[in-house]
Swiss-Prot record:
Record bears the keyword Disulfide bond: no
Annotated protein name in UniProt: Small ribosomal subunit protein uS4
Region (Disordered): 18-44
PANTHER family recorded: 30S 40S RIBOSOMAL PROTEIN (PTHR11831), SMALL RIBOSOMAL SUBUNIT PROTEIN US4M (PTHR11831:SF4)
Length: 202
């Protein structure tokens, strides 16, 4: 399944608030479609599927990428669900977003893809790059790059920078000081249901 490029508010009406995908809120509380206002009871599978879809659309990853993160999380010690969240949160595109350099994760991904972002002094144009403690994230020393990010910072996607990051606004320099803690994940999600969804599939 490819990365979604359709109407974002249609997705938030179906899945709820997705802070990484869009800053806008859906006007209607019920899902889109002819039968969106129905109250039909959902199956356990449908509930687990919805939680999985929240991850995919919020972080902008394909099904294949998400399966890779699930498999990687299973090979580590500790909570598989929390590890999946940490892997997604520590992606470069998400880190740029959480530092306030872009209003959404798709916007941050575009900055990375176009070579505006440096990690430890080198251009990294891979959005899925896994940031590590000690990484220093800066803006390429070009007038266009700096103006883009300064404009983005006028309208940040989220108000608070998580505790594992620090950011110096005058120099547009961010630093990764650790791995994100669960309480700082902005997406409202039950990651255990995601693990259950993939228990027989990934």
């Amino acid at each position: 399944m490819a990365r979604y490029r359709g109407a974002r508010l249609r997705i938030t009406r179906r899945l709820g608030e997705l802070p990484g995908l869009t800053r806008k809120s859906a006007r209607r509380e019920y899902p889109p479609g002819q039968h969106g206002q129905g109250r039909r009871k959902r199956s356990e599978y449908a509930i687990r599927l919805e939680e999985k879809q929240k991850l995919r659309f919020n972080y902008g990853v394909s099904e294949k990428q998400l399966i890779r993160y699930v498999r990687k999380a299973r090979r580590t010690t500790g909570s598989t669900g929390q590890t999946i969240l940490q892997l997604l949160e520590m992606r470069l595109d998400n880190t740029v977003f959480r530092l306030g350099m872009a209003g959404t994760i798709p916007g941050a991904r575009q900055l990375v893809n176009h070579g505006h972002i440096l990690v430890n002094g080198r251009v990294v144009d891979i959005p899925s790059y896994q940031c590590r403690p000690g990484d220093v994230i800066t803006v390429r020393d070009r007038d266009r790059s700096r103006k883009l990010i300064e404009a983005n910072m006028e309208f940040p996607g989220l108000a608070n920078i998580p505790s594992h990051l620090e950011f110096d606004k005058p120099t547009l320099t961010g630093k990764v000081n650790g791995i994100i803690e669960r309480e700082w994940v902005a997406l409202q999600i039950n990651e255990l249901l995601v693990v259950e969804y993939y228990s027989r599939m990934a």
